[in-house]
Structures are given as C-alpha cells and as structure tokens.
Amino acid sequence: MPKYNFMSQTNTIILRFPEGKAAEFERLFKAEVLPLWRRFKSEGKFLAASLTPIQGGMTPRKGLRHYILHVEVPGMAEHEAFDSHPLFTKFLAKAQAMQAEDPLVWFGETLFQV
C-alpha cells in the first residue's frame, strides 16, 4: 500500500565540495537550510529530506567530499516554492561558490514507495 494517496516527486542531487570547504558547507546548511526544511516539512510541503555524506559505492577524487541530497515533495509546486524561497536562494549562492564541480541533479514522479 502506498505511503501517500498521490504520487510524489523525488529529487536527488549529488553535491561535490573540496574537503577544505566541506565543514563550512555543513555549518551553513545546518544554520540556513535545515530550519527551512523543518518549516516546509511542518507545512506539508516536504514529505522527507536528507543530506548524507557519501561513504560507499564510489570513491570520490582525492580531496573531494560528495553528498547525496534527497528531497521528496508532494509535487512540482512545492519543489518550485522551495527553490525560489529567498532564504534558500541566499544560501544557494554561497554554496555554489564553494562547490568543486556542478551538482548532478535528477528528479521525477515517484513510481513505487513503501
């Protein structure tokens, strides 16, 4: 039985930062994005969200730290509401300046879920 009565949207982004910038990225994320995630979750605009340092499955180039950013939203409207939120766009400018490479981004309508 589906967890929700509708098809959600799953978003996955691979972020890549120089090791020397990873702690600063994590600090900024915790201070600036995590409170916004919690707000969106409490308002029903996020179903789930996580930021996970990659520890297996592939070996990043020496000196880089990779993260999996995973967000599940009810649909594209909530996705766009978050992406255009002023607090997020302010954070995004800082995070993009720290990234070693452009992120890898995927999203789509969730097919199966438990």
Language model features by range: what are they?
Residues 21-51, 90-92:
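Short amphipathic alpha-helical segments
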Residues 36-41, 72-77, 93-98:
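Glycine-rich loops and low-complexity Gly/Arg-rich segments
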Residues 2-6, 45-65, 90-114:
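Glycine-rich beta-strand-turn "strand-cap" elements at beta-sheet edges
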Residues 2-21, 27, 111:
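Glycine/serine-rich loop-strand microenvironments at binding/catalytic pocket rims
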Residues 14, 33, 71-73, 105, ...:
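Extended aliphatic helical segments
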Residues 28, 82-85, 94:
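Residue-level signal for well-ordered alpha-helical positions
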Residues 9-18, 48-86:
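Short, well-ordered beta-strand segments in beta-rich or mixed alpha/beta enzyme
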Residues 31, 71, 77, 82, ...:
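Intrinsic disorder/low-complexity signal
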